[in-house]
A protein has these predicted regions:
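Walker A/P-loop-proximal flanking segment of P-loop NTPase domains
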Residues: 3-23, 27-117, 121
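The catalytic "switch" region of P-loop NTPases
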Residues: 9-11, 34, 44, 223-231, ...
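Charged, low-complexity surface segments at secondary-structure and domain boundaries
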Residues: 21, 153-157, 320-326
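Short, charge-rich amphipathic segments
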Residues: 35-46, 67-92, 207-222, 263-284, ...
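Charged, low-complexity, helix/coiled-coil-prone segments
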Residues: 48-56, 83-101, 174-189, 217-233, ...
Length: 327
C-alpha cells in the first residue's frame, strides 16, 4: 500500500501448525535462527509456518500452554490433561486413543505431556510408527513388537534388570523365529549367546540389537514380516505376559511409576487399515497393564460402531483451535 509503513511486528504472536508462542522476554537474538525464521513483514508470514511439531528441546522457548480455552471453550477442560493425570494412576483401563485433525497440535501436546511426566520421574518412550513401520501395510502384531522393544529400551535406559525367567522368555520367543527366518535383512546376526541372564553385561543391549533387525524386516522384508507376525498371532498372550513382567520390573525400579508408551503417526493410517488393526484386535492392544497412548484417525469416530471401542480404550479428542472474527 503506497505510503504505508509496516510496523515492527516481530514481538507478536505467530501461529504455526502447532500454535507456537513467541515470547519477547525469552527471545535470544543470537539463537534466532536455531529454531525457525520469524516474519518481519506480512509477506513473510507464510514462510514462518512450519508443518512439523515442536520438539521437546523447543518447548521451553516456543510452547504456548493456554490454547485449551479456544480449543474446548473452557480453559479447565483438557483432553491432554485428562490423559496426563490418568497415566499417573494405575488402572485396569490404561490404554488411550487420541483423536484430532491433522495439524491440530497432537504431537506438540504429547511432547509437552511427555516432558512433564519425565519431570515427575516417569519414563516415556515415543514410538515413531511412521519411521519404524510400513504404514501402508500395518498389522496389530507390528505394534506389539514395537511395544516390546520400547519396554526393553526403557529397562536398559533406567538400569532395570528383569528377572532371568523374563529375559529367557523374551530371548526364546524370538530366537525360535529368527532361526527359521535366518539372517536379517541388514545382514546382521540374530543369535544370542546361550546362558545369558539379567546379570550378564549387555544383555538388554543384545535384545535391542535383535529388535533392530526385526524392525528392519517389518519395514522392508515381506517374507520375514509374515514370520514375525505369525509368531505374535499364535502366542500373543505369552508375549503380553513377558512385556508386563518387564514393565513391572521397570515400575519397581522407578518406585511405583509405570513406564508410559506413546505411539505416534497412527492417525496417518488409511482409515480402513486403522479400523482393521484396532477394531479386530481391541482386546489385545488394550490388554496391557501399563499406560499406552495411540494416536488415531478422527474420521473413524463418526462410524456408528465406534462405540464398540469404548469398552477397551479411553478415547479423547484434541479439538482444533477455534477463531472468532469481528464480522
Amino acid at each position: 500500500m503506497p505510503g504505508y509503513q509496516m510496523p515492527d511486528i516481530s514481538p507478536l504472536l505467530f501461529l504455526q501448525a502447532d500454535t507456537i508462542r513467541y515470547d519477547k522476554s525469552r527471545y535470544d537474538q543470537q539463537n534466532r535462527s536455531l529454531f525457525m525464521k520469524f516474519a518481519e513483514t506480512i509477506q513473510d508470514i507464510p514462510n514462518a509456518f512450519r508443518p512439523g511439531p515442536l520438539k521437546i528441546e523447543e518447548l521451553g522457548q516456543f510452547y504456548y500452554d493456554k490454547t485449551m480455552s479456544v480449543r474446548t471453550g473452557d480453559a479447565y477442560i483438557s483432553p491432554i490433561e485428562d490423559i496426563y493425570e490418568a497415566c499417573k494412576v494405575p488402572s485396569e483401563q490404561n490404554t488411550f486413543l487420541l483423536l484430532g485433525h491433522k495439524g491440530c497440535g497432537k504431537s506438540t501436546e504429547l511432547n509437552d505431556m511427555a516432558a512433564r511426566l519425565a519431570e515427575d520421574g516417569y519414563e516415556i518412550h515415543m514410538v515413531q510408527c511412521g519411521t519404524d513401520l510400513d504404514l501402508n501395510n500395518p498389522l496389530y502384531a507390528d505394534l506389539l513388537i514395537l511395544m516390546g522393544e520400547a519396554l526393553v529400551t526403557i529397562a536398559d535406559r533406567t538400569g532395570c534388570r528383569p528377572d532371568e525367567d523374563t529375559i529367557e522368555t523374551v530371548k526364546n520367543f524370538w530366537q525360535e523365529e529368527t532361526e527359521e527366518v535366518g539372517t536379517l535383512t541388514d545382514g546382521s546376526s540374530i543369535e544370542m549367546e546361550s546362558g545369558v541372564s539379567s546379570e550378564t553385561p549387555g544383555t538388554l543391549t543384545k535384545l535391542l540389537h535383535l529388535f533392530a533387525g526385526i524392525k528392519s524386516d517389518l519395514r522392508y522384508s515381506e517374507e520375514n514380516r509374515i514370520c514375525y507376525r505369525n509368531r505374535i498371532a499364535k502366542r500373543s498372550s505369552e508375549w503380553i505376559f513377558a512385556m508386563e513382567k518387564i514393565a513391572d520390573a521397570i515400575t519397581d525400579t522407578l518406585d511405583g511409576r509405570q513406564p508410559i508408551l506413546i505411539f505416534e503417526d497412527l492417525d496417518k493410517l488409511n482409515p480402513q487399515d486403522a479400523w482393521d488393526v484396532f477394531y479386530r484386535h481391541a482386546a489385545t492392544l488394550a490388554g496391557v497393564s501399563f499406560p499406552v497412548i495411540y494416536t488415531f484417525p478422527i474420521a473413524l469416530s463418526y462410524r456408528p460402531d465406534f462405540a464398540a471401542l469404548e469398552g477397551y480404550f479411553t478415547w479423547k479428542t484434541l479439538p482444533m483451535i477455534k477463531q472468532e472474527y469481528s464480522d
